[in-house]
Regions:
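A composition/biophysics-driven feature that prefers long, compositionally simple stretches
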Residues: 1-174
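C-terminal helix-coil-helix/basic helical segment that borders enzyme active sites and/or dimer interfaces
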Residues: 177-186
Length: 186
C-alpha cells in the first residue's frame, strides 16, 4: 500500500462527515479512483462491477469485487478480510443475472435496505442497468446522487499526499532536465 492504514481511516472519516452533511447513510462508490482512495484497491478490473460501500458509521468500507480479483483486493487494500465482499463468477455474463443482484443481497443482509443511499450517478462504470438493479432490488431505500462526494473530499490533500506529489514533481523535473540535455532536432 502506498499509504498507511491511518491515512485511509482519515479519508473515511472525511467522507463519512460529508455523507452526514448530505443526508446519505450508505454510499456506493463506483468510480475506480474513489475505490482506490477509500480502500487502496487499484486493480484494472473496473470494466466489470466493483465498488466501495461506505456506511456512515462503519469503521471500514466494504470492497465489492469479483472472485478473480479477490486476491488483489486482499493484498492491495488495508481492509480486514471480512470487508472484502467477493461475488461469484456465475454473475458474469449470465443475463439477466448481474453482480448487483448479489450487492443488493449484501445490503439487505446488513439491514441497510431502508437507508438513504448515495450513488455516483455520473461514474463511468455505473450503468443504467446497475442503477435499475439497485432501484428494483432496494424499493424501500431512498436513492440519491452523491454529487461526486468522494471526488470533492479528494480535493483537500493530506500532508502525506502532498509529500508524494512533491516527490513526483522532483522526479519529473529531473527527467525533464535530462531530456532537455539529450534532445536534438530531427
Amino acid at each position: 500500500m502506498l499509504f498507511n492504514k491511518e491515512e485511509y481511516k482519515q479519508r473515511l472519516k472525511k467522507v463519512q462527515k460529508m455523507m452526514q452533511d448530505k443526508g446519505i447513510e450508505l454510499l456506493i462508490s463506483h468510480d475506480t479512483n474513489n475505490l482506490n482512495y477509500l480502500t487502496g484497491y487499484d486493480a484494472w478490473s473496473f470494466y466489470y462491477a466493483q465498488c466501495a460501500i461506505v456506511h456512515v458509521n462503519a469503521e471500514e468500507p466494504l470492497c465489492f469485487v469479483r472472485a478473480q480479483d479477490a486476491g488483489g483486493a486482499y493484498i492491495k487494500s488495508y481492509l480486514k478480510k471480512e470487508n472484502v465482499i467477493v461475488y461469484d463468477e456465475n454473475y458474469i455474463h449470465t443475463w439477466p443475472r448481474h453482480p448487483y443482484d448479489y450487492l443488493v443481497e449484501i445490503i439487505k443482509e446488513r439491514k441497510w435496505d431502508k437507508l438513504s443511499i448515495g450513488l455516483e450517478m455520473d461514474s463511468h462504470y455505473f450503468t443504467a442497468f446497475c442503477y435499475e438493479k439497485i432501484k428494483q432490488g432496494l424499493p424501500n431505500a431512498t436513492l440519491k446522487d452523491s454529487d461526486r462526494l468522494v471526488n470533492w473530499t479528494r480535493l483537500v490533500k493530506s500532508e502525506t499526499e502532498i509529500g508524494y506529489m512533491k516527490s513526483a514533481a522532483l522526479i519529473s523535473e529531473v527527467g525533464m532536465k535530462k531530456a532537455m540535455e539529450v534532445i536534438n532536432p530531427g
